[in-house]
Amino acid sequence: MRIKDIVTFVSKTITPKQGVTYNLYSLPSFDDGKTSERLDGADIQSNKYDVPNKCILFNKLNVRFRRVWKVDNQDENKISSTEFLPLIVNEKVVDFQYCYYLLISDSITNYLCGQNTNTSGSHKRIDPNNFLNIEITLPKMSIQKQIGKTLSALDHKIEINKQINDNLRASRAQSQTQFELCRGEAVNADVSPNLPLLDRSLKGAEACLVA
């Protein structure tokens, strides 16, 4: 069995139109919290792939970063960078969640890292045909579902912990800023009333020196 036996690469291209709002799945938006961008077609510079309602977007550029995106929503006008391969999962053969974790597995990632084409500098792309022809072995569907469910639950917990840590860091930064502001106000409050006395003391000292 090969990857092409469990997913279908959908290569329908879209030319964005001015005045139409699109949900764009791009590499920058993946890196920035995996949230698609809402853009007018006039702000999108090139043709994109149409994104099915339920699919997996597999990035063919620099696969070592594992930019693999699960999509499962009814949003209209979903499009993606052509650096992604939109893959519809054959759920009669493979569990959707299991398929996702299979595609980001070390074995597939390491294999593809050795199959890069167009390799120059930091931009290394895979050949989609090489990817789709990778041989795989699937466990029974019941085992797939169990594995997919377990790994998905772990990822969910990791994401929640990340959000908690991000909020704590933001809260600490805000508290530190407020502390610095309050400390500055306290210093000014302590020093300001004494400025006339300080000024007179300096003048007195100068008078003594002159005498």
Positions of predicted regions on the chain:
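Short, basic/aromatic beta-hairpin or loop at an interaction surface
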Residues: Y22-E37
